[in-house]
Amino acid sequence: MHGLLLAGLAAALPLGVAGLPARQQSGLSPRGIDINPYRFASMAKYSEHKATSQMVHSFSYSKDDDYVATATKLVKSTFPNMTFRTVKDHYIGTNGIGHVHFKQTAHGIDIDNADFNVNIGRDGKVFTFGNSFYEGEMPKTNPLTKRDFSDPVKALHGAIKTLKLPVKPQSAKAMPMKEAETFKFEGTSGALSDPMAKLVYIQKDGKLHLTWRVETDVGDNWLLSYVDSKETETVHNVVDYVASADYKVFAWGLNDPTEGQPTMIKDPWNTTGTGSPFTWHGDGQMDYTVTRGNNIAAQDNPSGGEQWENNYRPDSPELSFVYEYNEQMEPEQYKDFAITQLFYTTNTFHDVLYSLGFTEEAGNFQMNNNGKGGEGNDFAICNAQDGSGTNNANFATPPDGQNGRMRMYTWTTAQPSRDGDLEAGIVIHEYTHGLSNRLCGGPANSNCLTELEAGGMGEGWGDFYATAIRLKQDDTHDTDYTMGEWAANMQGGIREYPYSTNMQTNPYTYADVQGMDEVHGIGTVWATILYEVLWNLIDEHGMSKNIMPKFVNGAPSDGRNLAMKLVLDGMTLMPCNPNFMQARDAIIDADQALTNGQNKCALMKAFSKRGLGANYKHGKTRVNNFDMPADC
């Protein structure tokens, strides 16, 4: 567990633990179709691993069963009087977990929002499961016998009229497909593909309703409209395959409320890359309307306890996370805003780091690794306004396959109190502990930053990434930055010196580590050195204003992202529990691997300036060396 220690604040702050430092209106959406009145209610139940192991231990499955058979037995045991079918998408993930999905049926007709998913562990036992099966009264008669439902063409007209879809049915004809009671419409215009219809049940308000599921792809909206099978101008529910979300937050690059105002951010996930293929609100199996998804589960935790699953999260069926904040409010009054900000910052950092190389195989934090390696099932649990402390923050990093945990605290250093969730630098610092602990020594070993100097670098990396990300386009080599200044309400921040390339402003060199006996001071020295690295590379390659890096021949084309990439790659190369010299060498090696050593001299200029010169010899006593390599 790591925190962001407030150096020099022992007398000023009541530290209990070691540590750091208008709602959008519903209506016509910008994408054209307002589906909010038609969204399905949430009915899913989920049994996590601990609960599952206690619930299903009495089940006895034959050793001859494959994982699909085992999953099927669980469903039959849970709902012995119900009918269902196995969905043909079962697979075994790279983490060894088998995934099987089932659809409930009635009279051979799908209940479209009644599902059961079973996950089978490597040992052949049920690992977890979830379901939304309908448990009410089933229809007594088979509707296919009487066929007292409307023609599918009428359902298409009903969907178009009720939802005002930009589709012209003209002389639409329903052409039967191979699947029973499934049709494709010919003779329409306005949709990107021929509309479709399928007869299905849905569960709503405790009852089953027979509907035509009308599928229309109109570009900005790809809709499944559930039209009543008899009253075809009644649309019960609508699903949109095109996900959209709005967040009112301090945008990426704004470190805290002193640097700007909250703004509306739309669909920020990096779906054009591969960092968040399920957006931020899905994990490939479940979609959420709260601040939870494949990468992050963000919630409040006022009690400070270990439980998080059922803690409060903002919930928006329309994915409009728009809440108010002003500096006169107490943290409790803006907890929705704070949780949303934490969710936004951590997800954005996840996507940035993914582009730089912190992927599934490298041990990143994701529930579903989507077949790309690594252990999975280990998204980051991020607690906002955690009640277990104040004036601090921390992050716990177990090995790959187990959840990381971030605890963000309120700060009693100002009136009203301030929320660390609103200072991006603190959030980024903490998440970087997860990065460095997963990369140094490999994702299966979280014990490679335990020695004093190595642990100090763990703190320094956090400050480095926090500072690199907050740089502004008009900053120069002479720009200085502090850490934790807003949250701590402390001019000059919580470190001994601000981060600066000016030796008078920040005189730290490697030799200063000699007299230090705690990780945060050592970390400030390491981050000071990396700040020199950062600006030398920006001076060489410029600084992009884009959130995501642009790559040329595999390397970021701008200096800021190149620095973040080389530092990250260096973590993967260095030994378990490295010292400064080994970390320096690993960064140089990372540049050799990435750019064939094009930046060696710019890097060594930074290291030698702060005492880690070419002729430095590591020993019990740290003595500065300011020499440059002969070939520079």
Swiss-Prot record:
Range of residues in the leader sequence: 1-19
EC number: 3.4.24.-
GO biological process assignments: proteolysis
GO CC annotations, alphabetized: extracellular region
Chief location of this protein within or outside the cell: secreted
Active site per the UniProt annotation: 430
Gene3D superfamilies attached to this UniProt entry: 3.10.170.10, Neutral Protease Domain 2 (1.10.390.10)
Keywords, alphabetical: Glycoprotein, Hydrolase, Metal-binding, Metalloprotease, Protease, Secreted, Signal, Virulence, Zinc, Zymogen
Entry-linked InterPro entries: FTP_domain, Fungal_virulence_M36, Peptidase_M36, Peptidase_M4/M1_CTD_sf
Gene Ontology terms, MF aspect: metalloendopeptidase activity; zinc ion binding
EC top class, as a word: hydrolase
Binding positions (Zn(2+)): 429, 433
Glycosylation sites: 81, 270
Cofactor entry: Zn(2+)
Removed propeptide positions: 20-244
CDD domains for the chain: M36
Cofactor binding mode and count: Binds 1 zinc ion per subunit.
Family of this protein: Belongs to the peptidase M36 family.
Function: Secreted metalloproteinase probably acting as a virulence factor.
Protein name stated in the entry: Probable extracellular metalloproteinase 2
Gene responsible for this protein: MEP2
